[in-house]
């Protein structure tokens, strides 16, 4: 076995063990009512960690995305492994981790989601609509997620106009995302209920934070794209103590998007949530803003990571 394959196998075993730790943590939380209260809905009788029958909800699996064949299983899209995703991720120029605050599918209370792999395991996501066997990417979350990955993958080798031309063609965008060796984690750690407020997300992070940190350290990204808002950024600032903003003097100086940790050799891009409709404005102003900020800071990023 080659050295990089050995490293990949060791990493897979450790990442698989992480989800056993998540399950054990959930069992512990469920046995302590004062902890359950932290993530409850507004109604005292509700418990967001169990379903209406009192059965513990599964932890949302996530990590390095699968890059094998996409398949439609009759009522949902899923994805197989090509057998070398972890090797490709470890060998990639930039190890990109996308941090989101919710899964990309929202389940109805009455829907049997047992087989919805994309619901429970983000690694199998295709970003195609589960409502049709047609290859259809029509959700705001998916389009913006794909587009932002494309911007990061292209900004060093393409002009602004060339990137905007790619962004105008969702099929080209999907093709780039489809082959990109990237990882995604869901900071909420529970699937379904596709939106969550900041205070509740912060509660989830406080309950699962120690294991989340272990998972992130194993994935060992060089770039984190934070789409989990303030709770996500606060969490990363606790993990990475030496973060400094490198675009604070860009434009009006009010917004801060790009941070680096010189000790950890890490870049964090703190952007709007992928479901924010402002990303889809006709003038593509927010996409342009991200491109400009990446170009503005490219010397610092290259010096850190190249």
Predicted regions and their residues:
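Residue-level marker of positions within ordered structural domains that often coincide
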Residues: 104, 149, 229, 262, ...
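Glycine-rich anion-binding loop/nest that anchors nucleotide
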Residues: 100, 222-231
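A polyanion-binding, active-site-adjacent surface
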Residues: 2-219
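C-terminal capping/extension of enzyme domains
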Residues: 2-17, 198-213, 233-306
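Short acidic, S/G/P-rich loop/turn micro-motifs used as interaction or catalytic elements
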Residues: 105-106, 191, 231-232, 275-278
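Hydrophobic beta-strand segments of well-ordered beta-sheets in folded domains
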Residues: 96, 222-224, 267
